[in-house]
C-alpha cells in the first residue's frame, strides 16, 4: 500500500486530511531553463566570472566544483592543495584549491625516477581559492588569487584529463544550482558556456537533468518517517478536532509537501492576524528537516506559531500550495502584512495569492547578507558598513535616503552590483523611511536573534531528524503556552510599579499588558532626556526637532493641527505599536494629559484576545480550552449516532436545543449575581465611609458616644465580610435549582453549541452528519428561523463519503469559531 492509499484508508471516515495531487511535468526545470544551460544561445553582456570573496556554498565539495568550472572556462586544471579539520569536532573547516601547476616538481620526478610521474608540469603557480567554514555550516571564499605564471588554454580545456567525466560534471551542475546563491548560479552558468566542451555538456544536461532535479520533487524523509507523521497527526486530530493538516503528493504518489496547524494557532490568528512572518531559514540549512514556519506575536509580544510545513523545495509551485493551504487553515483571512526573505519565487507567490497584503522583507534577513556579499568591499574600505547603516537608519525622508544611497554606491564603486541595484528597486519592502504606513508589531528587527523568527533556534540544529523534532514539538508548544498563561495571569492580577508621576504612565498601566507597558514606560521616563525645538510651522502642520540626549541624536516629529496626528521619524509607533519619547515630548508641549485613542492599539491591551475574557486567570483559561476540546469530541460522537435514524436525530436535536437553553440561562444567572454582588459591595463601602466619617466627627464627644460609633463601624465591617462567600460562590457554575456547585459537577451537560458574536451554531466539523434542517419546526421561540440561520448550527449530511469523494476539510465557517464568551445572551 503506497502513501496515498494509506492516508485515504485512514482518513476516509472523518475527513480530517487534505490530499492534493498535482502533476508538474516540468517541476523545477525552470531553475535550469532560467539560465539556458545547453544549446547554442550566446551570452550577451559582460559578467565578471571571477570567484569573489564572500560567495558562499553549502559544502566544500560544492566550492571545489565551482572552482573546477571556473578553471575550465579559463583553461587550466585544478587540485586540492590542502584541507584542515577541527580538533574538537573533526569536521572540515578549511580547504585550499589551487592550479595544478601550484608548487614545484620534485627532483625525483623531474629526473624520471618516479614510477608515478605527474602529468602536469609544476611552475610554482600561485593561483588558488581558499575557502573556510562559517559557524552556520556555510563555506565562504576567504581568499582568491587570480594570476598564473603560465599560459592558459581555454579552447583546449575539454581535453584536460580532470574535465573528461562530463556526466559527473552534469550531476555537479545540478547540485551547484541548488547549493549556491543566485549570483553564484549565474556566474557558474556563464563559465559553463565559455568552456571548451560547452555543447556536449549542454546536451547531456538536457538529457539527464530531470533525474537530478527529481530530488526536489518529493520530501526526502528517512525510512519510516512518513508513517510516524501520519500516526502523530491522527492522534492529535483525535484529541482535538480543530487540529488541521494537509498533504501534497506528487504524480508518483510520493509525499512532496506537508502542512499542519494546531487548534491554538488557529484561534490565536483570529485575534492577531495583522502581521505574520514566513520563515524558510531551516529549509536552507537542514536537509533532514526542511521546516518552514508561519509566526506571529501575541499581546505580550511573545512569538506565536501559526503553522508549520515540511517542503521538498523552494519552487513557485511549493510556495503557492503552501500559502493556499495556510489560508484555508486560517479561515481564508489574509494578514495585513507578511514578512519574508527575498526569494523571487516566494515574492511571486505572495503577489498572486495575497494581493491586498503588504509584503515586506525582514530587515535582519537583508542586513545579514551585507557582510557576505560585500566582504571584498569591507576589506578595502573599513567604513563601508558605517556608511551603509547610516543610509538605512539615519535617513528621515525618501529623498535623503536616495541621495545617501547613490553617494555610497558611487563612493565604493558598486554601480554595477546587481544585488545592490535589486535591493534599491525593492526599497519600499525593507527600508524604514519607506514603511511609515506599515505596522510591524516589533517583528522586523536588525538581528535574527532579536526577532520572533528565532522561535525554534535553540531546539533545531543541522543534524536533527524528524523523529527527534516530533518528540520535542509538543514540549516546545507547551512551554510557549505556559509562558503566555503566566503573562496573562500577571497582567490580570498584578499591578505594575509606576516610576513617575506622568499621567500617561498611570493611564497605560491599566490598559497595556505588562510586557508592553514596561516597554512604553521606558519611553515615558526617557522624555526628560529630550529637548524639542520648533523647526517650522504653518496653519496646518508644525515640525519639531527633538534632541535625544540619551541616544545622542536628533529626531524630527511632525504634528498635524487639523487631524491631531503625530509622526516621529524614528518610526517606533510603526515598528512597535506604541509612542516613542520624542512623540510624547510633543504631546506634552501640546497639553495632552492622556494618550489619544488612535495611538493605543487593541492588540497590545489586556482585552486583545477576542475569545477570552480579560479577567480570567491562567488556570481558568487552560481549563476552559480543555472543556471546549472535550465537548467538541463528544459532539462528534453524538453526530455519528444521531444521524443513523430519524428517531435518533430528533432525540439528539431536542437534547441540543434544551442543553443550549440551560447553559445560556446558567450563564445569564451567573452574570446577574456577579453584578448584584458588585452593587452590594459598593453600597457596603459607601456606608462604611459614612460611618467612619461620623466617628471622626464625634472625637470631642463623650467616651460612650465614641464606643457607639466604633460598634457601628464594626457591625458594618462584619456585614461586608458576610458578603464575601457569595462573591466567591458566584464564580462557580450554577445548576437549574439555584444550587451553586463546582464546574466539575455540571460538566456532563452537553453544551454542544458554539456561540459566535451573533446567534448560535454548532461547530461544522463536529455536527457534519445532522443534515439540513429547513423542514424542522421552531423548537424554542423561533430559535430556527430559516435555512440561513441554521447553516452555522449544523452541517450537511455527508458523514459517509459518496463515490469520487475528494478528501478536503470543510472550513468555510471556521473563521467565526472561538471559545464562548460569558456575556449575557438571550434566545
UniProtKB/Swiss-Prot annotation:
Region Disordered: start-end pairs: 103-126
Functional summary from the UniProt entry: Transcription activator that recognizes and binds to the DNA consensus sequence 5'-CACGCGC-3'. Activates the expression of FHY1 and FHL involved in light responses. Positive regulator of chlorophyll biosynthesis via the activation of HEMB1 gene expression.
Recorded superkingdom: Eukaryota
Lineage: Eukaryota, Viridiplantae, Streptophyta, Embryophyta, Tracheophyta
GO biological process, one term: far-red light signaling pathway
Domain notes: The FAR1 domain is involved in direct DNA binding, the SWIM-type zinc finger is essential for transcriptional activation activity and both the MULE and SWIM domains are essential for dimerization.
Source organism per UniProt: Arabidopsis thaliana
Protein's recorded name: Protein FAR-RED IMPAIRED RESPONSE 1
UniProt induction comment: Down-regulated after exposure to far-red light. Subject to a negative feedback regulation by PHYA signaling.
